[in-house]
């Protein structure tokens, strides 16, 4: 689906250049009209949320320069456009502004007014807490709250310790773009875990009816060892149970002897 960008957003700017011909040409001082057009286009691929931004520069109804966001730079369509394309590509400000229009123009329209609800997208975040180093009580450590695969970009992530918000020792990465338009962010909390403490990562996002809260509890090394021992015991129990059932099944079949003598006559 191609959406024409409104004129106020550089959709179709038509500039008519009035050039007076030199005396003696075209039979006198008659005016000549040269038409220069600029057109911007946003292409939304149905079902994929992928956007492609294309700008076309047209002189006297002939396109001579084109910018394609899939290419990332201006390309000359005709020899007339080669000097302009080379110049625009050599200017970081121009190239950066043109590349940014994928967001400021196309994505702005996509996320735009509520009247365009058919184009809106909401993706709920996934939230996971991890510890940067092997757990040890009363030693400095870092909790990492990984918030991934959410859209739109607006999100609020907070840390709580035993129900009280933590503001000291909190840091965050910049929003990281995924290839499918979704985002991810990491929010870290510098802390010293003590037995019985409960840390909570609290996430608010437009896609959620209520915030997501994920807890992490500080455990002593003995409690951690007991938990691992319990898991290991369960695994060994399942293995021995399966082995016993297999041996019993084999023993119930019994050895097969030769057929009765009467059947051989």
Swiss-Prot record:
Residues 28-122 are annotated as: Beta-1. InterPro entries: Ig-like_dom, Ig-like_dom_sf, Ig-like_fold, Ig/MHC_CS, Ig_C1-set, MHC/Immunoglobulin, MHC_I/II-like_Ag-recog, MHC_II_a/b_N. It is a single-pass type I membrane protein. Ubiquitinated in immature dendritic cells leading to down-regulation of MHC class II. It comes from the Eukaryota. The keyword DNA damage does not apply. Residues 28-226 are extracellular. Residues 1-27 form the signal peptide. Residues 248-265 are cytoplasmic. GO terms for molecular function: peptide antigen binding; protein antigen binding; toxic substance binding; ubiquitin protein ligase binding. One of its GO terms (cellular component) is multivesicular body. Glycans are attached at residue 46. Coiled coil: none annotated. GO terms for biological process: antigen processing and presentation; antigen processing and presentation of exogenous peptide antigen via MHC class II; antigen processing and presentation of peptide antigen; B cell affinity maturation; cellular response to type II interferon; immune response; positive regulation of alpha-beta T cell activation; positive regulation of antigen processing and presentation. Residues 217-226 are annotated as: Connecting peptide. The chain crosses the membrane at residues 227-247. Keywords: Adaptive immunity, Disulfide bond, Glycoprotein, Immunity, Membrane, MHC II, Signal, Transmembrane, Transmembrane helix, Ubl conjugation. Residues 125-213 form the Ig-like C1-type domain. CDD domains: IgC1_MHC_II_beta_HLA-DQ_I-A. Belongs to the MHC class II family. PANTHER family: HLA CLASS II HISTOCOMPATIBILITY ANTIGEN, DQ BETA 1 CHAIN, MHC CLASS II-RELATED. This is H-2 class II histocompatibility antigen, A beta chain. It comes from Mus musculus (Mouse).
């Amino acid at each position: 689906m191609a959406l024409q960008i409104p004129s106020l957003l550089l959709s179709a700017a038509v500039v008519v250049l009035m050039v007076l011909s030199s005396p003696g040409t075209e039979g006198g001082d008659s005016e000549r009209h040269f038409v220069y057009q600029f057109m911007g286009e946003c292409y939304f691929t149905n079902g994929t949320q992928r956007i492609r931004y294309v700008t076309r520069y047209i002189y006297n109804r002939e396109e001579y320069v084109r910018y394609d966001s899939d290419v990332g730079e201006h390309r000359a369509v005709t020899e007339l456009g080669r000097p302009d394309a080379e110049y625009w590509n050599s200017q970081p400000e121009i190239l950066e502004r043109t590349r940014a229009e994928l967001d400021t123009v196309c994505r702005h329209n996509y996320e735009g007014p509520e009247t365009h609800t058919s184009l809106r997208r909401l993706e709920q975040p996934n939230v996971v807490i991890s510890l940067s180093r092997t757990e040890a009580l009363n030693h400095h450590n870092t909790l990492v709250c990984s918030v991934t695969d959410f859209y739109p970009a607006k999100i609020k992530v907070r840390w709580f310790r035993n129900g009280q918000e933590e503001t000291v020792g909190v840091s965050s990465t910049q929003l990281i773009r995924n290839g499918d338009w979704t985002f991810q962010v990491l929010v870290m909390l510098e802390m010293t875990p003590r037995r019985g403490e409960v840390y909570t990562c609290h996430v608010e996002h437009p896609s959620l009816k209520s915030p997501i809260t994920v807890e992490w509890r500080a455990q002593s090394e003995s409690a951690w060892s007991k938990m691992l021992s319990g898991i290991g015991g369960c695994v060994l129990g399942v293995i021995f149970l399966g082995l016993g059932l297999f041996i019993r099944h084999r023993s119930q079949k019994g050895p097969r002897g030769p057929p009765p003598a009467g059947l051989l006559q």
